[in-house]
């Protein structure tokens, strides 16, 4: 029962349209009408069942769907290494486009899109009709031809039934042969038509999947190109949902336009023309009037129903976000014994969803009744006209069947016009959110004059730099210092003094507000980002690991490293023996964000990863803060030997780890340099550093 709820009405539409069961063995007008009524009753039963499931079981379905969203969101977060490192005091204010993109999944209302429909269709067409892929073009052309052929064959079915019924009124000798031939013809047409439709689906599905994959990969690539400001201001899970919904929107739009809207228009035109030439203009005019009334009613009611669907989706998203937030913070909930509070809050969101869902259900019933009323009145009028023609001798009994069959033929695709219309509108919104992401330009990027870093001795100069996050307070203020190539510089200071910001500026997560940062005389703003970051190894303060094996997480520092190199890096980080004592050794999966490992183990994996990267410039941001004193000394001694002769910048709170630094810089509030010198010189100053040192003894 949950599957119907998740598929939705358009999914039921696809199932019904791809496997019609009417006309199966009827050989008279009475059987035909009975099959018609049975189909409509079954259709109403499906829709009513869908509504009941939505009303009675949406709590369970929401939970399963929300939990699936949580797992998907967590899996996508694992793709982003280092994004959740020490949070800056940055404002969440971003550009309008970024705000729109990151909050898109909480705004499921059907609204005007930022990108024009035509521009989005052109973008999709580029992926659907790639210049260098003739296979996709052949598949599309073949699919369209198969579809049109299936429609032409389908229109022949009412004519075959007409001939069957007419043949039953002939002499006994003729009836022995003619109906058998017509019934065989009916079977052949039916089988061929269904075969064409299924073959079309098989041929086109690869094209759609390729297009969606290419768009999703392009968007994912763009997300990794965007700057840290964007990722710090995003909503949890929103990016993965934008990509997921956008991909599904493209898939639905392609299938609905190519295989529903266009074929329906073709079929209506064909049926109207057949009615005009076979039965007369009155029948054609009445059928077109019926279609017009049906379309206008469906579109207007669907627009009216949208407000209820918007509210329902909003409550769905809020309940989903609440559940994700609660499960992600599972330990916090337990620490404060607030299980009942979390359940109550989740229940309140579901109650609001209930209200919106009931309105959606009742409005759907009104839509279904109105659609049925329009077609029933039209069907009745046409049957009266046809019956009069039979009585007057102008039409045969078979023509009565023909009228019934032709009108029913065009009622099938129109049966789901409201759903298709609404879903197309929603698909355009979802695609707009996806393409808004795809069209975002990073604030930090290469320019046309960017060049690879030409490393000589690795001298780094921070020249009179100032920086603040958006409109927040000044983080760094006219800071200047030089780290000579091969030297070890340590930076200390109170929390919020801008120590970690120096790393983000050096790595170009942000650009300085004023001043410059140079490596061997080259302004880093003129260096290609990939080249710059390739030359800098980082051990972040907050170690975030992929939900993969320990081996994978260490080898991430150099994906081309051999097993021996990975193990040597682990030995240098003093974690090799710890790994071997685990049940699965290097194949041990570390869990979401590495939570199956202790803080010290995660930090040593991070150190091993930096060792494996083997960069000429190394930046430690509280690299051993989670280690005990003994392990810290062992690792620092090993790192000192490994990175001897390399430019090293260390951020530390434990001053004992930096006593041998060539220079120590003490930052104060506002990013001002208070003191600088080596360990002994700073102790003799009897200033900030000395007081910090004495406090730790």
Curated annotation (Swiss-Prot):
One GO BP: culmination involved in sorocarp development
Domain ABC transmembrane type-1: 140-426
ABC transporter domain ranges (all copies): 460-695
GO terms for cellular component: ATP-binding cassette (ABC) transporter complex; mitochondrial inner membrane; mitochondrion
Residues that span the membrane, as ranges: 140-160, 176-196, 252-272, 279-299, 366-386, 400-420
Membrane topology: Multi-pass membrane protein
Statement: the UniProt record of this protein carries the keyword Endoplasmic reticulum: no
Localisation: Membrane
UniProt keyword annotations, A-Z: ATP-binding, Membrane, Nucleotide-binding, Transmembrane, Transmembrane helix, Transport
Sequence positions that bind ATP: 493-500
Pfam families attached to this UniProt entry: ABC_membrane (PF00664), ABC_tran (PF00005)
Gene Ontology MF terms: ABC-type transporter activity; ATP binding; ATP hydrolysis activity; ATPase-coupled transmembrane transporter activity
Stretches for region Disordered: 73-111
Feature: compositional bias, Low complexity: 77-107
Record-linked SMART domains: AAA
UniProt main location, coarse: membrane
Family as reported in the entry's similarity comment: Belongs to the ABC transporter superfamily. ABCB family. Metal importer (TC 3.A.1.210) subfamily.
Protein name: ABC transporter B family member 5
């Amino acid at each position: 029962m949950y599957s119907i709820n998740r598929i939705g009405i358009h999914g039921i539409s696809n199932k019904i349209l791809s496997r019609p069961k009417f006309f199966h063995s009827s050989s008279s007008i009475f059987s035909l009408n009975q099959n018609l009524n049975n189909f409509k009753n079954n259709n109403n039963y499906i829709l009513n069942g869908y509504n009941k499931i939505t009303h009675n079981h949406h709590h369970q379905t929401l939970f399963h769907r929300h939990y699936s969203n949580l797992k998907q969101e967590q899996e996508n977060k694992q793709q982003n290494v280092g994004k959740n490192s020490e949070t800056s005091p940055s404002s969440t204010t971003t550009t309008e486009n970024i705000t729109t993109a990151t909050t898109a999944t909480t705004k499921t209302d059907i609204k005007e899109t930022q990108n024009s429909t035509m521009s989005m269709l052109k973008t999709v067409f580029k992926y659907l009709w790639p210049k260098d892929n003739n296979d996709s073009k052949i598949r599309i052309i073949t699919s369209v031809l198969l579809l049109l052929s299936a429609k032409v064959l389908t229109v022949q079915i009412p004519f075959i039934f007409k001939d069957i019924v007419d043949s039953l009124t002939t002499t006994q000798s003729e009836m022995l042969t003619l109906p058998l031939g017509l019934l065989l013809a009916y079977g052949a047409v039916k089988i061929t038509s269904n075969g064409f439709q299924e073959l079309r689906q098989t041929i086109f599905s690869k094209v759609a999947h390729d297009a969606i994959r290419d768009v999703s990969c392009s968007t994912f690539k763009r997300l990794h190109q965007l700057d840290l400001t964007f990722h710090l201001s995003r909503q949890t899970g929103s990016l993965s949902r934008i990509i997921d919904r956008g991909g599904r929107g493209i898939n639905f739009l392609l299938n609905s336009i190519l295989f529903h809207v266009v074929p329906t228009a073709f079929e209506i035109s064909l049926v109207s023309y057949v009615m005009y030439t076979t039965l007369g203009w009155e029948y054609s005019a009445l059928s077109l009037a019926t279609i017009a009334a049906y379309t206008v009613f469906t579109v207007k009611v669907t627009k009216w129903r949208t407000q209820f669907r918007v509210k329902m989706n909003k409550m769905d998203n809020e309940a989903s976000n609440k559940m994700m937030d609660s499960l992600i913070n599972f330990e916090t909930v337990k620490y404060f014994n607030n299980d009942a509070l979390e359940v109550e809050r989740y229940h309140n969101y579901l109650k609001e969803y209930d209200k919106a869902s009931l309105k959606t259900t009742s409005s759907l019933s009104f839509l279904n009744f109105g659609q049925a009323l329009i077609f029933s009145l039209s069907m009745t009028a046409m049957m009266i006209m046809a019956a009069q023609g039979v009585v007057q001798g102008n039409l045969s009994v078979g023509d009565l069947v023909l009228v019934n069959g032709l009108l029913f033929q065009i009622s099938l695709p129109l049966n789901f016009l409201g759903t298709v219309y609404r879903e197309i509108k929603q698909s355009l919104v979802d695609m707009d959110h996806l393409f808004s992401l795809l069209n975002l330009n990073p604030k930090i990027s290469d320019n046309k004059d960017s060049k690879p870093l030409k490393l000589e001795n690795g001298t780094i100069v921070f020249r009179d730099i100032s920086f603040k996050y958006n409109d927040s307070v000044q983080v760094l203020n006219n800071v200047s210092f030089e780290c000579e190539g091969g030297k070890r510089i340590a930076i200390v200071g109170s929390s919020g003094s801008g120590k970690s910001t120096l790393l983000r500026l050096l790595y170009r997560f942000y650009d300085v507000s004023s001043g410059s940062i140079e490596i061997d005389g080259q302004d880093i703003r003129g260096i290609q980002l990939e080249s710059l970051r390739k030359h800098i190894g980082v051990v972040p303060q907050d170690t975030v690991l992929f939900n993969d094996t320990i081996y994978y997480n260490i080898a991430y520092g150099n994906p081309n490293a051999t097993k021996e190199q990975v193990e040597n890096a682990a030995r240098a980080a003093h974690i090799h023996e710890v790994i071997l004592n685990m049940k699965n050794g290097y194949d041990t999966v570390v869990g979401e964000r590495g939570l199956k490992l202790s803080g010290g183990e995660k930090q040593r994996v991070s150190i091993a990863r930096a060792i494996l990267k083997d960069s000429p410039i190394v930046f430690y941001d509280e690299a051993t803060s989670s280690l005990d004193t003994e392990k810290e000394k062992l690792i620092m001694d090993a790192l000192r030997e490994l990175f001897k002769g390399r430019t090293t910048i260390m951020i530390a709170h434990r001053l004992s780890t930096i006593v041998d630094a060539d220079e120590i810089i003490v930052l104060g509030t506002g990013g001002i340099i208070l003191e600088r010198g080596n360990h002994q010189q700073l102790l003799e100053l009897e200033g900030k550093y000395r007081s910090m040192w004495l406090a730790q003894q």
